[in-house]
Amino acid sequence: MKILVINSGSSSIKFKLYDMSDESVICKGLIEQIGAKNSYAKIVTKTGEIAEKREEIPDHGTGIDVMNELLFNSHALTSLDEIDGVGHRVVQGADLFNDAVLVDDDVLQKIEELIPLAPLHNPAHLAGMKETLKVRPDIPNVAVFDTVFHQTMPKSSYMYPLPIEFYEKYKIRRYGAHGTSHQFVAKAGAKILGVDFDHFSCITLHLGNGASIAAIKNGKCIDTSMGLTPLEGLMMGTRCGSIDPAIVPFLMKNANLSGEEIDTIMNKKSGLLAIGGSNDMREIEARMDAGDENAKLAFEMFVLRIKKYIGAYISILGEINAIIFTAGIGENDARIREAVCSGLEIFGIRMDKDKNAAKKDEPRRVGLPETKVRIIIVPTDEELAIAEDTLRIINQSKK
């Protein structure tokens, strides 16, 4: 079976086509700058052949047409009939969805109702789904939500200590993000250690430009760092993470900033960028090595906040099998991994520096073998996880 995975952003479409008989990637591609006159489209086949084009792509509907054209011209497909299903990434499913679902009018309506909780993401996801269904309504489309894995959090974890009517009226609570990634790498970690996932407990660290951490007990998420939005939690590339909420009214009063301006600052002008001058950890480390004190401070703040969460999560999980690093920084930055694990020896976490420094693009253990808690690096593959969920939901619908 062939499954097409689509991730529609506000001005982009990323896609991957899988052969699910062996979970191999047939091709992958992206379309950028949708709405601009000089939009960019690219596809890469499994043999490494690349096709690119620049033309005006005014909207997502045209973007889907361009995607199909790329799929045909690259010979990844000869007909849309070859596609058995389409899986769509959806950032926010709130508490309306506790699993991936076949897309129908009711699902589209619910995703639209959740736009206030994800104003940058859900409209783009909707556009991708609607346009795909418009082209071939007979091909099953499945919505896979970033928030589903976090739906097992207990109420004590997801509620905020605010007036209860804010939750009842506006659904203000912790939803988390990166759930597809956290679940994927946790399952991979359990497989590496030969532990049944239902009896596997770990802490997963998705460290990229966006960063989050999750506490997983017996295969279920019981807490995560991101909240109502992806702004809460860890320090990130351009996001501040958790701060004193009183800073917002303070800035409104003393800096004469609007709520919208502060939201932009906290999402796009804070984090590593604000303190160290770059949202790229590689640049931060290069500046730090050159003697830049602000870059050093940014590095230390980033690590400290991760360690605080690890300590807190160990206290609520009790015994854990592993700490798992993933995403751009988590998978590739040995220096960050070593700094994060340094000082955690009291919890049975000890890094093997040689294994940690080795550069490999595969799941691997990097802790000392005699330690109680394993340290594992797992390259995340959210698209494959979406493809697997899509296939599962389609098969269930046939029973």
From Swiss-Prot:
GO terms for cellular component: cytoplasm. One of its GO terms (molecular function) is magnesium ion binding. ATP binds at residues 14, 206-210, 280-282, 328-332. Keywords: ATP-binding, Cytoplasm, Kinase, Magnesium, Metal-binding, Nucleotide-binding, Transferase. Signal peptide: none annotated. The active site is at 146 (proton donor/acceptor). Substrate binds at residue 89. Mg(2+) binds at residues 7, 382. InterPro entries: Ac/propionate_kinase, Aliphatic_acid_kin_short-chain, Aliphatic_acid_kinase_CS, ATPase_NBD. The record marks 178, 239 as: Transition state stabilizer. Its EC number is 2.7.2.1. It is found in: Cytoplasm. Its main location: cytoplasm. One of its GO terms (biological process) is acetate metabolic process. SUPFAM superfamilies: Actin-like ATPase domain (SSF53067). HAMAP family: Acetate_kinase. Homodimer. Belongs to the acetokinase family. This is Acetate kinase. The lineage of its organism: Bacteria, Pseudomonadati, Campylobacterota, Epsilonproteobacteria, Campylobacterales. The gene is ackA.
